[in-house]
């Protein structure tokens, strides 16, 4: 996948797979330098690959977390015992070469503080197998980015491995692991029917994975997940159906930025597979139902990581020039602490390279021993020296263990001995071998204009950056320079231990140290010692090809030279100065050439500047002090964690394309870059601290200056709860992230006193939206097992506020309409509009006469004119007698009781549907689009006319200048003519020249007119094509919108009809009951016996009558509904019928326009030319001869028939 191309990425990362031999265990001998005792052990790895563990003869178990392992070495690279007795003990039996059976496992919390586990195998093959397997497990990218469920399983595995000799789990280990709240642990154990005394232990079989899960649910209850579960459909039922689960995944968890064709939403069968995987109740799973327990498991499962595994994999295009990548770079790689004192270490080169760094620095100085071996140290400081040769060996050993892409060696060469420089070159050639790139590649010669080769072209290659010997200088001057530097640099051997300045750090190899002013002194302090670099010898020069350091002069000079193999280094202060003064030029420079930024010399504590500053300018090698894990280094680790941890990250497109210019200080949206909107809601935390303290979470954003927001959000501090604090606060919204591909989100947790707990740095482009666990990491970017933050993230393409209403209306038209109506009512209540409306209705005549007309005449080119029948009528034009859309009219009372309760329901007409706000909103949007289109073309036309006016003036001025010269010559000739000796043939020649000049001028005007006419014609045709295409699309959208509005309104009307039917039945019963009461009242006037008989008869007949009337009413209601549905269908068909009609009208309109266009353009050009020539004649700037020739310019205009003949079959409906 080195040359990954855009599209669906095929995941190349392999999940953790532990071989059987590692699971079963193997016998080894463990030894330590500090002791002469060797210990036979059985070494194993758990099936999930979480831990390395071993048991000795006393059956005591020790663990080593594989996430702490940095490297595994065997053979000559493994650590060898120094003590001869120890070596003898280890080589018992002489089974095979001891060196080939030795293994060293390197582990530690960071790059500096490392430890070694030294082992000896009994067979060479076993040593190789274990070395390869352990290194593979330790560097597995999926293992470093496990799901929440996997981290909880890791904690469980640790408890299961740390057992007593009897195979029982001590409860003290559980209390130690979950130490934040002892009382909670005790209660959770009791809930699982387990003993709770700290001194007790439990059998392994009693603490199964299911029991462990129940224990966690009691220890850390999750009410917030219950709320999400019920909110998404499980209110009345204790489960989610497969459809509800599908909606949850597709609506909440899916990234809306993804292409739906390449990354389609999940289907039912795919969701069913997930349910079967995570739902513990098999009977529910078979029915496609998911309980809250299964839902919790899904949220913490591997499918629901906050970053897609594809982003961790090598997924970027690695075939572009080297200058198109950010390259993970180290400064003063050999240092383990500060810049002035402390140890230098060969091991730092191994650790830095293993961590993914691809550019390391070597500060080389002349060795002062008898062997004359060059050394690496920080000059003029009290840091220790290390062997240059050992460093080269270390680089060769670890160069390509974690990444196959090229290594760049940045030499700061102070070795003023030609002999020692020759040694350095020889070591590089011999130790690196074929990996050292000695000659440029055939496809990429060192020539101006040729780009750098790609990381893919340079795979498994080592490139040297060192001063290149100048062939212009003589050999003698070179020797003189070397001798001068020798006397200056090492005049006294003790000078190495005397710091020359507080800023004794690196300097750029191109710094100018000849100036003496204050600015240069400050610059020198920042830049450090590299100004005194030695002259490169022939041997070292021969190693340099694609990375030739040169003194930076200016961006203009670099652009003129156009040599991609030349690069410059900038101390951070100089780099910041260039970034501030010339940001766009800096970005342009970095498209073609490499630049290296390094910390200023005054950072004696090895602190770091923020690398984001220079990534924003496209700087490739932003070198940091890897030994200092501050925020800047954490951001750097977060950056290079992705793309297969290859050490290379492809720069954003605008920082690579030569046809685009990018300003890192931009505050607006960049054309061609889709900005994002990001919303983060911190919901809760789990096991954040091992102490009973309050906790809080902070959110930061880093990116372009406009995107960066430090401490953008902070939750409230939880009160003494670090186990399961719930915040449920309002989300923090990053409304506009201008450059998402270079922005990252940082979520960090702290204890109430401000003590750092853990954090996670996530690239905005890689973040998955939805409900996710953020598994925290420590400041060294190593994963923490238990601490996590549960969040809800929304990420989408940014929509400016101008279009927010349109997007809202499109995404949820009903809610939008309701919201608009609600706002209108609220405003009316505040502005007393209701009373005004009442007054207007009381005197309609006055209103109609006084109210100003607000009706706008739609412009001819506005995109709505072509749909005149779709245009809504303004409210002021609507007659007052017209009922509201979907209103119900009550007819006059009749004797028929059914008709008296039956109300008439009218279907909404097309005109009424067009009054709907969502439809009107779309029309306004289309109007704006057409207005913008016409405006753009008008601007082009204006520019073209200006261009032709300028050309006309040029022709005219040239003509006048030449005519004046001829007339002047004619005057001289006339003077000569008056002399007797002058011949008479001169005047006739001048008249011929003037006539020729006039003819030439006329022809130029004709050519100019023809050209102008053709260009204007092309431009206007292009405009008409655009208009026609836009209008055609608008018709489609408007018809679709009107259809949708009709369906929505009609569905609402049918729902409302059901309510009306129920009301009518109640009204009918009410009226019939009233009649019955009247009859009963009449019967009361009769005698008692007759009254009882009539009352009984009335009740019987009343029941029959009610049944009959209800039946008749239902029949009438049914017929009414059928008529309404029929009318609805008719209206929808009318809407659909409008589409071809409008399209036909549009076609005809533009056929007519295209036919008229050539004549219109011709007339326009002729009038313009006439006017111009006439104006010039009035001002005396055009001679009569030229003005008289104006008629020659007016050519005959072609007829429409001629145009058709010249353009047979010409179609004017082709979209742009």
From Swiss-Prot:
Reaction catalysed by this enzyme: a 1,2-diacyl-sn-glycero-3-phospho-(1D-myo-inositol-4,5-bisphosphate) + H2O = 1D-myo-inositol 1,4,5-trisphosphate + a 1,2-diacyl-sn-glycerol + H(+); a 1,2-diacyl-sn-glycero-3-phospho-(1D-myo-inositol) + H2O = 1D-myo-inositol 1-phosphate + a 1,2-diacyl-sn-glycerol + H(+)
The organism sits in which domain of life? Answer: Eukaryota
Concerning CDD domains, the annotation shows:
C2_PLC_like, EFh_PI-PLCbeta1, PH_PLC_beta, PI-PLCc_beta
Q: Where in the cell is it found?
A: Nucleus membrane; Cytoplasm
State the EC number(s): 3.1.4.11
Broad EC category: hydrolase
Bias (Low complexity) ranges: 491-501
Q: What does this protein do?
A: Catalyzes the hydrolysis of 1-phosphatidylinositol 4,5-bisphosphate into diacylglycerol (DAG) and inositol 1,4,5-trisphosphate (IP3) and mediates intracellular signaling downstream of G protein-coupled receptors. Regulates the function of the endothelial barrier.
Q: What is this protein called?
A: 1-phosphatidylinositol 4,5-bisphosphate phosphodiesterase beta-1
Q: Which organism is it from?
A: Mus musculus
Name of the gene this protein is made from: Plcb1
């Amino acid at each position: 996948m080195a040359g990954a191309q855009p599209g669906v990425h095929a995941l190349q990362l392999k999940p953790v797979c532990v071989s059987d031999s590692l699971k079963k265990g193997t016998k080894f001998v463990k030894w330590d330098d500090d002791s002469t005792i060797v210990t036979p052990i059985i070494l194993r790895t758990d099936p999930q690959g979480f831990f390395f563990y071993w048991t000795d003869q006393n059956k005591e178990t020790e663990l080593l977390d594989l996430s702490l392992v940095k490297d595994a070495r065997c053979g000559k690279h493994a650590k060898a015992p120094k003590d001869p007795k120890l070596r003898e003990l280890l080589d018992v039996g002489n089974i095979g070469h001891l060196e080939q059976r030795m293994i060293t496992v390197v582990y530690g919390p960071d790059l500096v503080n490392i430890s070694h586990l030294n082992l000896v195998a009994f067979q060479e093959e076993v040593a190789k197998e274990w070395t390869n397997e352990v290194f593979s497990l330790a560097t597995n990218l999926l293992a470093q980015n496990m799901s929440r469920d996997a981290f909880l399983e890791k904690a469980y595995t640790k408890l299961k491995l740390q057992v007593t000799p009897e195979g029982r789990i001590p409860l003290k280990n559980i209390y130690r692991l979950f130490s934040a709240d002892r009382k909670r642990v005790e209660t959770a154990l009791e809930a699982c029917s387990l003993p709770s005394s700290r001194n007790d232990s439990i059998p392994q079989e009693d603490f199964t994975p299911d029991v462990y899960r129940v224990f966690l649910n009691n220890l850390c209850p999750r009410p917030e997940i219950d709320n999400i579960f019920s909110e998404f459909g499980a209110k009345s039922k204790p489960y989610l159906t497969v459809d509800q689960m599908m909606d949850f995944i597709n609506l909440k968890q899916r990234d809306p930025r993804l292409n739906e064709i390449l990354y389609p939403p999940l289907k039912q069968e795919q969701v069913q597979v997930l349910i079967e995987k995570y739902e513990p109740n098999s009977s529910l799973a078979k029915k496609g139902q998911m309980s809250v327990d299964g839902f919790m498991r899904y949220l913490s499962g591997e499918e629901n990581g906050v970053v897609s595994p594809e982003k961790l994999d090598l997924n970027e295009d690695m075939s572009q020039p080297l200058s198109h990548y950010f390259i993970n770079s180290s400064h003063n790689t050999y240092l383990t602490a500060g810049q002035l004192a402390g140890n230098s270490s060969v091991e730092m080169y191994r650790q830095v390279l293993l961590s993914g760094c691809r550019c390391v620095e070597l500060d080389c100085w002349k060795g002062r021993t008898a062997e004359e071996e060059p050394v690496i140290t920080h000059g003029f400081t009290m840091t220790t020296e290390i062997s240059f040769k050992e460093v080269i060996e270390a680089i060769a050993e670890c160069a390509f263990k974690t990444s196959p892409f090229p290594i760049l060696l940045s030499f700061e060469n102070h070795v003023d001995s030609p002999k020692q420089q020759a040694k350095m070159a020889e070591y590089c050639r011999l130790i690196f071998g074929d990996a050292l790139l000695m000659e440029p590649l055939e496809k990429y010669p060192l020539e101006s204009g040729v780009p750098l080769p790609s990381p893919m072209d340079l795979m498994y290659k080592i490139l040297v950056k060192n001063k290149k010997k100048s062939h212009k200088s003589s050999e003698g001057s070179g020797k003189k320079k070397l001798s001068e530097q020798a006397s200056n640099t090492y005049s006294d051997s003790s000078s190495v231990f005397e710091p020359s300045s507080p800023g004794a750090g690196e300097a750029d190899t191109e710094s100018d140290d000849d100036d003496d002013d204050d600015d240069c002194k400050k610059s020198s302090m920042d830049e450090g010692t590299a100004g005194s670099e030695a002259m490169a010898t022939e041997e070292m020069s021969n190693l340099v090809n694609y990375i030739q350091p040169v003194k930076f002069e200016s961006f203009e000079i670099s652009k003129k030279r156009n040599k991609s193999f030349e690069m410059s280094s900038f101390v951070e202060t100089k780099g910041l100065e260039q970034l501030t003064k010339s940001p766009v030029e800096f970005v342009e420079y970095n498209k073609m050439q490499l630049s290296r930024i390094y910390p200023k010399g005054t950072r004696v504590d090895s602190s770091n500047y923020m690398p984001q500053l220079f990534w924003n300018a496209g700087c490739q090698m932003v070198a940091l002090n890897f030994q200092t894990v501050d925020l800047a280094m954490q951001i750097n680790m977060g950056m290079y964690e992705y793309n297969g941890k290859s050490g290379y990250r492809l720069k954003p497109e605008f920082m690579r394309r030569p046809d685009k210019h990018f300003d890192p200080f931009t505050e607006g949206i960049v054309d061609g870059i889709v900005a994002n909107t990001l919303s983060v809601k911190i919901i809760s935390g789990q096991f954040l601290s091992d102490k009973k303290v309050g906790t809080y979470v902070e959110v930061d954003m880093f990116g372009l200056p406009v995107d960066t927001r430090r401490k953008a959000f902070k939750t409230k501090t939880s009160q003494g709860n670090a186990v399961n604090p719930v915040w449920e606060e309002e989300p923090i919204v990053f409304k506009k992230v201008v450059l998402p591909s270079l922005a990252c989100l940082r979520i960090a947790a702290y204890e109430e006193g401000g003590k750092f707990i853990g954090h996670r740095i996530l690239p905005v482009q890689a973040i998955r939206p939805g409900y996710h666990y953020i598994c925290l990491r420590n400041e060294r970017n190593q994963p923490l097992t238990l601490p996590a933050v549960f969040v809800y993230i929304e990420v989408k393409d940014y929509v400016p506020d101008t279009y927010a209403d349109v997007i809202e209306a499109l995404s949820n038209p009903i809610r939008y309409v309701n919201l608009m109506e609600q706002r209108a009512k609220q405003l009316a209540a505040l502005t007393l509009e209701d009373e005004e409306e009442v007054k207007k209705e009381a005197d309609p005549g006055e209103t109609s006469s006084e109210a100003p007309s607000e009706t706008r005449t739609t412009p001819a080119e506005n995109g709505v004119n072509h749909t005149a029948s779709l245009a809504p009528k303004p409210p002021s034009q609507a007659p007052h007698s017209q009922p509201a859309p979907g209103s119900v009219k009550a007819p006059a009372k009749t004797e028929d009781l059914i008709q008296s309760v039956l109300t008439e329901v009218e279907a909404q007409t097309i005109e009424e549907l067009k009054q709907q706000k969502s439809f009107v909103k779309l029309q306004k949007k289309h109007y704006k689009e057409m207005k913008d289109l016409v405006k753009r073309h008008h601007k082009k036309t204006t520019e073209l006319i200006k261009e032709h006016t300028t050309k006309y003036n040029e022709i005219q001025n040239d003509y006048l200048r030449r005519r004046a010269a001829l007339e002047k010559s004619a005057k001289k000739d006339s003077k000569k003519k008056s002399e007797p000796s002058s011949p008479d043939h001169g005047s006739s020649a001048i008249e011929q020249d003037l006539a020729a000049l006039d003819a030439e001028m006329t022809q130029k005007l004709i050519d100019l007119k023809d050209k102008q006419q053709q260009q204007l014609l092309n431009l206007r045709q292009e405009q008409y094509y655009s208009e026609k295409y836009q209008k055609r699309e608008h018709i489609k959208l408007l018809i679709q919108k009107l259809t949708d509005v009709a369906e929505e309104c009609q569905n609402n009307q049918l729902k409302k009809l059901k309510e009306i039917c129920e009301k009518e039945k109640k009204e009918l019963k009410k009226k019939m009951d009233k009649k019955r009461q009247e009859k009963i009242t009449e019967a009361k006037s009769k005698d008692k016996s007759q009254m009882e008989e009539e009352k009984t008869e009335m009740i019987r007949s009343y029941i029959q009558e009610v049944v009959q009337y209800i039946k008749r009413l239902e029949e009438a209601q049914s017929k009414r509904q059928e008529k309404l549905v029929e009318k609805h269908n008719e209206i929808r068909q009318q809407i659909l019928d409008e589409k071809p009609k409008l399209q036909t009208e549009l076609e005809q309109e533009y056929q007519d326009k295209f036919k008229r266009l050539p004549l219109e353009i011709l007339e326009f050009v002729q009038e313009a030319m006439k006017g111009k020539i006439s104006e010039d004649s009035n001002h005396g700037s055009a001679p009569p001869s030229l003005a008289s020739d104006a008629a020659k310019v007016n050519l005959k205009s072609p007829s429409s028939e001629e145009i058709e003949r010249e353009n047979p079959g010409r179609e004017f409906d082709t979209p742009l």
